[in-house]
Amino acid sequence: MAPSLWKGLVGIGLFALAHAAFSAAQHYFPSSGIKWKRKCEFLQSSSFQDKIFRSMYYVYDRSYMRLTEKEDESLPIDIVLQTLLAFAVTCYGIVHIAGEFKDMDATSELKNKTFDTLRNHPSFYVYNHRGRVLFRPSDTTNSSNQDALSSNTSLKLRKLESLRR
């Protein structure tokens, strides 16, 4: 099918999800708060005062829900079904928009490689490691340490001579 059809299906699914969210919000906050707006007309329209009004209305609505014993009321089944159906439609459309997935089976890529090159990563080869020192015979170790010390002192002397000039 055409990609625009799947994009349209995703759009319809997202619109249905937004509608379900709006319906759920209306279910939990059913009244418009006109009574409280009339009582609070002395409040001018500023962002801080709007926040105060919303918090007062929320407390009023919660206490009303407690008095009518509707506090633990769940969402109606039509809102729940609309949410689930919209989610399924959106996911179905997204899967078709994504296109064909690549196979996870790597045999096609490994056909032209030999066993020697299969796990061969030359960039991980390390030639300068402690194995040279650890597995060297002990008599050569002492002489090499003395050679290293003498070369270090001669190097230091050369540096000092260049500084004196």
Curated annotation (Swiss-Prot):
Residues 1-3, 98-165 are cytoplasmic. The modification Phosphoserine is found at S154. One of its GO terms (biological process) is tail-anchored membrane protein insertion into ER membrane. Pfam families: MMgT. InterPro entries: MMgT. The keyword Transport applies. It is a multi-pass membrane protein. Residues 23-77 are lumenal. Keywords: Endoplasmic reticulum, Endosome, Golgi apparatus, Magnesium, Membrane, Phosphoprotein, Transmembrane, Transmembrane helix, Transport. One of its GO terms (molecular function) is inorganic cation transmembrane transporter activity. Its main location: endoplasmic reticulum. It comes from the Eukaryota. Component of the ER membrane protein complex (EMC). Part of the endoplasmic reticulum membrane protein complex (EMC) that enables the energy-independent insertion into endoplasmic reticulum membranes of newly synthesized membrane proteins. Preferentially accommodates proteins with transmembrane domains that are weakly hydrophobic or contain destabilizing features such as charged and aromatic residues. Involved in the cotranslational insertion of multi-pass membrane proteins in which stop-transfer membrane-anchor sequences become ER membrane spanning helices. Belongs to the membrane magnesium transporter (TC 1.A.67) family. This is ER membrane protein complex subunit 5.
